[in-house]
Amino acid sequence: MAARWSSENVVVEFRDAQATAMSVDCLGQHAVLSGRRFLYIVNLDAPNEGHRKISRQSKWDIGAVQWNPHDSYAYYFAASSNQRVDLYKWKEGNGEVCTSLQGHTRVISDLDWSVFEPDLLVTSSVDTYIYIWDIKDTRKPTVSLSAVAGASQVKWNKKNANCLATSHDGDVRIWDKRKPSTAVEYLAAHLSKIHGLDWHPDNEYTLATSSQDNSVRFWDYRQPRKYLNILPCQVPVWKARYTPFSNGLVTVMVPQLRRENSLLLWNVFDLNTPVHTFVGHDDVVLEFQWRKQKEGSKDYQLVTWSRDQTLRMWRIDSQLQRLCANDILDGVDDLIDGISLLPEPDKALQPQDSEPQHSSGHGDEEALKEDFLNDLLVGKKTDQLGLPQTLQQEFSLINVQIRNVNVEMDAVNRSCTVSVHCGNHRVRMLVMFPVQYPNNAAPSFQFINPTSITASMKAKLLKILKDTSLQKVKRNQSCLEPCLRQLVSWLESVVNQEDSTSSNPYALPNSVTTPLPTFARVSNAYGSYQDSNIPFPRTSGARFCGAGYLVYFTRPMTMHRAVSPTEPTPRSLSALSAYHSGLITPMKIRTETPGNLRLYSGSPTRSEKEQVSISSFYYKERKSRRWKSKREGTDANNRPIKAAGKVIIQDISCLLPVHKLLGELYILNVNNIQETCQKNAASAMAVGRRDLVQVWSLAMVATDLCLGPKSDPDLEIPWAQHPFGRQLLESLLAHYSQLHDVQTLAMLCSVFEAQSRLQGCPNSYGPFPQRASNLASHSRYPSFTSSGSCSSMSDPGLGTGGWSIANKDTEQTSTPWCESSPDEFRYSNLMYPDHREREKDQHEKNKRLLDPANTQQFDDFKKCYGEILYRWGLREKRAEVLKFVSSPPDPHKGIEFGVYCSHCRSEARGTQCAICKGFTFQCAICHVAVRGSSNFCLTCGHGGHTSHMMEWFRTQEVCPTGCGCHCLLESTF
C-alpha cells in the first residue's frame, strides 16, 4: 500500500506562547497550551478568534497537562510543574487554580486521569513513587506505588478501572491499585528509555510502547516475555498512540539531522508501510490528541502542537479510517445490514454447548451482529499470530504420524479419544475441551476402558498431562499435540524401565525409588516479575565469620559464562526475561536427562529450544568435535560429575586483633584487681603481645590501693584527675579503638569498673537517667553497627546494636576537678538545693577513672566482646564480662505524670523510687502501695486504687484524705 500524505486543515500560530504541553478537553471545545507565564485556552471551534489566558507565577515549565475526561468534570484540568500538580478550573471564560497536590520530592514526569472515576488522578515522578490522588481530599495521596527506578510514563487502563501501567527506563510495570505493595507484571520492553505508553482502547491486556531504540512494540502483559508485534523505525519514536477508530496507530518520530517532522498513521495489522503521513510542522511535534467526534459526523480531528509554536488540526475522513481497518472487515457494514436475512443454521451443525435462539427480536439481532463482528476480529488477529482459529483447525493440524497413537477427533462435541499401545501397556483416554479453550482454559482428561496401567501410574500420568496443558493454555496456545507426545514418551520410559529390570535376573526390586521418565526434561526457566525480589544466585562469594574464620566458595571448573565477561551479572531472576525475549543475545538451555538432573552439570547437552535458566547463563557450549565424540562415547551415568565448587573455610585469627587464647587465659578477679592485671600481663606475654604487657602493667599501677581517692573532696585532688589517671586511660582506649581491638577495650573497662565498685563509687545511672544519656551522646567513641552475624543460640536480650571504634584525637574532654559549665551548674542547682550535696556528687564522679559520660559506650564494648566469647564457646568468660554491664533504666517515652516519693520526697518515675527503693505512693483509702491501675486528682495530688476511688466517689464529693478538695469538679476539664 502506497503511503499517502496530506496537509493540515487548520493552522493557528502562537508565537508568544512558548508552550511545552497541550491537551484537548473531552467535549472537544477547548485546548490548553501550557507556557511558563500563561496558560492559553483556545476555542477549537474558532481558533483564530483570539484566546484566553490564565496567568501563573512559577519559574518552572509545565511538564504535563491534561483535561479531565469526564463530561461532568470537563472544566477541570491538571498541570504539573516541578514537584507540584495544580488543579485548574475553567468555567464561563474564567480560569483559576482550585488546589495543588504536593507529595513528590523530585520532578513529576507524567500524569493521567482515570477513565472510570472522575476524582482519581495518577502522577509519576523521578523519585520512584507513583501517587494516586483523590481530588476531593488533596492532603495526601490515597494510594502510593513504589518502584526501584523513577517512572517516566503512567497511563490508566481504558477497560479495567483498577489497572495502570508505568514505564521505568526500558521496563514497564503493570499495577493493580488494590494491591499497591508490588506490581502485577513486569515487562522488559526495550533496551533504551521508553518515551510513550498507550493502552489499546478495546483490549484491556494490550498496550503499545515507543522507545529511544527506534521501535514501537505491542504487548499482551499476560505474555510478558515476548512482544506481539514490532514496528521498526529508522529514528527514535517520541509518541505512539492508538486511534479512537478501527486499528490505527499514530506515531511521532524524533527528527535526526533536519529530517521532516511529520506524523505517521499506521494499520497495526500491516506495519510494513504507513497508510498516511501528516506533513506541515517545521519542528518537533510535542503533543497530539484526538478531538471528540461531532454529532452526525463520521470524521475525526487530530490536534497537534509543535515546537514551531503552531497548533494544527487534521481531518480524518471515513476513507482514511477504512485504511486502518482489517482487510477482512472491508464491506462488513453490508454484511451486517443483511445478516437478518440469513437462513436459520442447520441444528445438526451446531455444537452441543451452544445456546438456542428463542426469539428473533431486536436485542438478539444486535447480539448476533456483535458476535459476528467479534468473530471476524478474533479470526483476523489469530491469523496474524499464526495460531489455530478453531478446535477443528487444531485437529486438522495435529501430526497423526506420532508412533503408537490413534486419535479419534469429534469437533462438534469438542472432544477426542486417544488410544496408545506401548509394550504390554494400553491406554485409552477421553479428552474434553471447554468452550473457552485455549484461552486460559485447559482440557480435562479421563481414562476409559480398556486401560491396563495401574492406579498409581494413572495418577502420575494425569499430573504430567495437566501440567503440560496448563503451561500451554496460559499462553493461549493449543496443547493437544504436546500432551500426546508427553503421553507416548512417558509410556516408553515405563516400558524401558521394565525391560532393563527384567534383563538383569540378579537385580533387587526397588519399591522406594520411582522410575524417572527417559524423555528429555528442560530445566525451569526464570524471569517473571514474581522473581524480581529474588537475587541472582551467586557462583562465588566470601563471608567473614565472627569466630575468626573466612568462608568462601568458588565456581567449578566446568562452569563458564555464556556471555562476555564484561557483561554484568543480572541483579535478580526477573532480569533474565530480557534474554528470553531476544533483547539480549539468547543462550542455549541444556536438556537434562535422568542421569544428570543437576543445576550445575559437568556435561551439558544441546537443545533445540532457546529458553533461559540459571545454569544456562553460565554454561558455554563447546564446539570441539573431539570433545563431542568423546562425550558421545562415554556413559554419562558412569562419569563423575562435579556438581558444585568447593566451600573453603580459612582460619584468619592471625589477622584479627582479638585472640581466642587470650580469651581463655584472661581473668577477672574482682576481689584482687592487682592480681588480675598481673596475670593478664603474663598471658599477653605468652601470646607475644608486648604492647598489652605494658598496658596491663600501667593498669596495675593505676589501680594501686595507695592511689585510692579520699572521701573528703577538700583533702586532695583524686588520682583520676591526674594526667596519668583518666587522661592516660582515655588515650589507651582511643588507641585500641583505632585498632578495633574490642577484646582489650572490654577487659580494661571491666577491670576499672570493678575497681570503682571496690572504692564504693555509685553507679553512673542515678535517679535522673536523662542526664546520663545526654552525656553519653557526646562520647568520643561514636557508635557504628557491627556487620558480623550473631549466633542464633545467643541471648537476644544481651545483644548490642554495635560498638564504636573511631579515629578520634585524644585531647582531654573530661571536666576538670571542681569545675563545671554554667549548664551543669544550673542543672545541679535544680537537683541539689544544697551546694555541698552538689560538690559531693561531683567529687564522686571525679574519683572514677572511667568517665561516667561514656558508660553506654563502655557497655557496648563489653557486649560485643561477650558475643565473641560466645562464638568461641567460652560461656563462663562471657558471663564474667557481662557482669560489669550496667543496667540503666528504660528510656522515657511519651508523656506521664511525675510523682514525688512518699518516703524520701524525691522525684520518681514508675511505681518504685530509684533512690530509696520504696513504693512511690500509697492509696488514700487502704494505705497500701499502689502498683496497678490508679487514679489521682491533678489539683491536690491525692488518689489511689481505681476501684477504691470509684467506690468512694459514688457517694462522696470531697477528697478521702480530708484536704477539702472537690476532686471530681477540679479534675473536669
Curated annotation (Swiss-Prot):
Biased composition, class Polar residues, residue ranges: 351-360
Binding residue positions for Zn(2+) 1: 901, 904, 913, 916
Binding site for Zn(2+) 3: 937, 965, 967
Residues involved in Zn(2+) 2 binding: 926, 945, 948
Ranges: WD repeats: 57-98, 103-143, 146-185, 189-229, 232-276, 280-324
CDD domains, A to Z: mRING-H2-C3H3C2_WDR59 (cd16692)
Chain ranges passing through the membrane: none
Recorded superkingdom: Eukaryota
Sorted UniProt keywords: Lysosome, Membrane, Metal-binding, Repeat, WD repeat, Zinc, Zinc-finger
Stretches assigned to the RWD domain: 393-494
Gene3D superfamilies the record matches: YVTN repeat-like/Quinoprotein amine dehydrogenase
Complexes and interactors: Component of the GATOR2 subcomplex, composed of MIOS, SEC13, SEH1L, WDR24 and WDR59. The GATOR2 complex interacts with CASTOR1 and CASTOR2; the interaction is negatively regulated by arginine. The GATOR2 complex interacts with SESN1, SESN2 and SESN3; the interaction is negatively regulated by amino acids. Interacts with DDB1-CUL4A/B E3 ligase complexes.
Family assignment from sequence similarity: Belongs to the WD repeat WDR59 family.
Described purpose of this protein according to its UniProt entry: As a component of the GATOR2 complex, functions as an activator of the amino acid-sensing branch of the mTORC1 signaling pathway. The GATOR2 complex indirectly activates mTORC1 through the inhibition of the GATOR1 subcomplex. GATOR2 probably acts as an E3 ubiquitin-protein ligase toward GATOR1. In the presence of abundant amino acids, the GATOR2 complex mediates ubiquitination of the NPRL2 core component of the GATOR1 complex, leading to GATOR1 inactivation. In the absence of amino acids, GATOR2 is inhibited, activating the GATOR1 complex.
Name of the protein in question: GATOR2 complex protein WDR59
Organism of derivation: Gallus gallus (Chicken)
Organism lineage: Eukaryota, Metazoa, Chordata, Craniata, Vertebrata
Gene it is expressed from: WDR59
